[in-house]
Amino acid sequence: MPGIIYILCSILLIESQYYVASENAEIRSSCRTAPNDLVFILDGSWSVGPENFEILKKWVVNITSNFNIGPKFTQVGVVQYSDYPILEIPLGSYESIDDLSRRTQSIQYLGGNTQTGNAIQFAIDNLFARSLRPLTKIAIVLTDGKSQDDVKHIAEEARKNKITLFAIGVGSEIEESELRAIANKPSSTYVFYVEDYIAISRIREIMKQKLCEESVCPTRIPVAARDEKGFDILLGLGINKKKAKRVEGSRPRNKAYEITSQIDLTEFTGNVFPEGLPPSYVFISTLRFKIKKKWDLWRILALDGTIQTAVSLNGEEKTLSFTTTNEENGTQAITFTTPGVKKLFDEEWHQIRLLVTEEDITLYVDDQEIETRKLLPVIGIYISGQTQIGKYPAREESVQFTLQKLRIYCDPEQNKRETACEIPGTNGECLNGPSDVGGTPAPCICPPGEKGDPGPKGDSGQPGNPGSPGQPGPDGKHGFQGTSGSPGIPGSPGVQGPRGFAGLKGNTGQDGEKGDRGMPGFPGLHGQPGIKGEMGPKGDKGDIGIDGKKGTKGDKGGNGATGKPGRHGEPGSYGKDGIPGYPGQKGEEGKPGPPGMEGLRGLPGIPGIPGNDGANGLKGETGLSGEPGARGPTGTPGISGPEGISGPQGPVGPKGNKGETGPPGKASPAGMKGEKGEMGIPGQQGYTGIPGLMGPKGDKGNLGERGMQGHKGEHGSSGMPGLKGEHGVTGSKGEKGEIGEHGHRGITGPRGEPGNMGLIGAPGPRGMSGERGTQGLPGPKGQQGKEQSEAFIRQICLDVLKAQLPSLIQNDIRQNCNQCKTQEGSPGLPGPPGPVGPEGTRGHPGLPGRNGFSGLVGQPGLPGIPGTKGLPGKPGAKGNKGDIEPGPQGSPGVPGPAGLPGVGKDGRTGPLGPPGREGDRGPPGTQGPPGDAGICDPSLCYGAVMRRDPFRKGPNY
């Protein structure tokens, strides 16, 4: 059973291919015939102006004229936007370029603010979302000012829905960053800028080429850091399935395919080029061959086998030929015979590159420009035949050669980026990768290795540039209604307008205001012959407007220009009302809006306005009897003609659909209810008034008194439809930012001043008893003084130490620290985080700090309080005065009483004698009387007590 299903499916597939081939046999596929949905999103804000908007419409007509219009081809939609978007032309509404052009020319300029994001969202929801064709979707956004709403996120949503966005900015007020946010990437392909609307015609051809690339070249080829639209013909012809032998290419790291007579590189053209070829492209091939005959490197055949496009080489004459289509003769061939071509036949590796445009073709060999030749106009190709590589002319036999690359790039600019670096002996860096068919890839495209360890933290960067302006804030609240702008020059006849409302019985009066929407200028100048001649055959014929030969029908045409009947059936669009007369409505929500379709009446009675339409326009009479002629393009406003004679009252038009509720207007007091009046005589039609805001439909009532004119507003000069909003509410304070990373170590600061002396440290532990020192040299003999006890002397030293030791230590520390070499201390442990401080204003990034100096060596702790001195040993007995020469050591004598101070001369110091034997401890003597105040050297006492220098390391001595 599965086998039967497989066979049936195969039969159906084969039949479907033949069906497609036969169906497309008479259709030349090209950019013109490619099916896609194309939507223009046009800026209709005040900054554009009516004249520039006319230029914009002509530009749209010129762009769309390059495509076949219809369900099988391109479908065009148009959205105009200002404060709100309006669906001017739905997708698929027209099936001919003439009808589409006429409808495009009839679009009326809106005026208002710039809400670009809202318009893009409107196109997504109301055009692309309703299209049932799974085709290329393209939107072109044209604007001349900064959007007053968010465009970035809405544009991202469009791209998620596979909508390609082009952005075209006009004038000096445009922001490049906003255009880049709207358009696809790269911006060099999808963003355009011109200085004014006159210059927009300069990008018409390049815009046509880009649109063709989107519809004809859907595939992408990875080249360097970007993807180029184009065709990899080797892959398209299934080279990997043909069992072609892989060999070494132009360089050792490149790989190529060896094509032999046993390998047939043939494929159905519809599978390789489903929409034909673009109007301009770059053909490139890297190859090596030894063939001495004529052969086709690449060719596209029609169903009958005739060549439509081909690149051929002639080994006998050493020439290269390019064949393509032609409108007159079907095909045209260009042969390059210059000496630069002959190097192709030296049996070495070479690169052939052809830059094909709509006007000419240029040959490059190994990146050297050889010659440029003119081309006749080219037409599309039949895709029902075959595409082949490496074939002899008019034969199916394959040629033996080696092929490394065969591609077509749809963007002509790729010709400037392409190099021949893969050819030995040429200069240039290979940015496109080493090969098209495999081998060792360049380092830049190798698969990533394992993630390495984090590197050291880099230095702080320089302060960043100021950030880009933030997104526009939310719309402000509606302000008080501005004063009504001063009426235009022809505003005086508007007084008779209320009589017209009375004739339509109240609510239908709003329909009349709907008829005034669009304000196309004075209708009398529609179709000046000069302007229509400039428009040419692109839909600017203005058939009826030019000749004015239809008499009464001409009058009817003038009336139709005011009514714009084609736009009345679109619900939700905002009309522009004239100067309000007796409103007849309650008026609680502002001026009544224009939801109706008054324009269908034709408004007879103003035949004098057209002026140039001939003498028949002087009398309205029975203008409804004839069929209205085709509408000509809107002409530029001119001097108003004389006021025509009132015609008979026309029939009451049908009531239009209710329009959307407009922004609330300033409330006005309700008029006094009057008696219902009889139908009044229709007055002369007033000139188009200043556009007002459409309010919600009020309760039906009788005619009231005319409301008072409002106060003059800030933007009332042209009756802007939008109410100026108040400044937006200040945004809430942002959330506190995250704690930043730890900064680098700061610059080493200068050495600080010595700090104040710290508190005396806690007493240290008692030191161990030191070894007994050697006996010092005897000092000079002093005068005999009063004998003092050891305890008394010790107490004096302790008192002196307590009084003077702190200052001595402090001075000693300062001296030692000023002389010692600062050593680098180890960094301390980070302290605990401090409490969160109040949020400060965000500062600019600081400059990177330098490394700080090493900290000072910490002060050593103060010495502990000296331990209690042991009891002194028993002093030895004083010996007798020795002679000059030392005598024998005598035995210790008994201490005698203190004698009077003797007056003697110091003797010479004798040699050091042997240490004496410690004498027996004698009984303590009696306390003597207090002696005179002596002078105790604190340093001696300090040394005696401490037995060492506390700032010196080493043994005690």
UniProtKB/Swiss-Prot annotation:
VWFA domain sequence ranges: 37-211
Q: Where in the cell is it found?
A: Secreted, Extracellular space, Extracellular matrix; Cytoplasm
The record, for InterPro entries, names:
Collagen, Collagen_Structural_Proteins, ConA-like_dom_sf, TSPN-like_N, VWF_A, vWFA_dom_sf
PROSITE patterns on file: VWFA
Q: What keywords is this UniProt entry annotated with?
A: Collagen, Cytoplasm, Extracellular matrix, Repeat, Secreted, Signal
State any GO CC term. Answer: collagen trimer
Q: Does the keyword Acetylation apply?
A: no
Annotated Low complexity bias:
483-498, 597-616, 633-649, 775-786
Top-level taxonomic group: Eukaryota
Q: Where is the signal peptide?
A: 1-16
Q: Where is the composition biased (Basic and acidic residues)?
A: 535-556, 733-744
Q: Which SMART domains match?
A: TSPN (SM00210), VWA (SM00327)
Q: What is its main location?
A: secreted
Q: Name one Pfam family in it.
A: Collagen
Q: Where is this region: Disordered?
A: 441-788, 820-935
Which residue intervals define the domain Collagen-like in the entry?
A: 448-501, 502-543, 544-591, 592-642, 643-684, 685-741, 742-786, 825-882
**Domain spans labelled Laminin G-like:** 230-412
Q: Which SUPFAM superfamilies match?
A: Concanavalin A-like lectins/glucanases, vWA-like
- Which family does this protein fall into? Belongs to the fibril-associated collagens with interrupted helices (FACIT) family.
Q: What is this protein called?
A: Collagen alpha-1(XXI) chain
Gene this chain is encoded by: col21a1
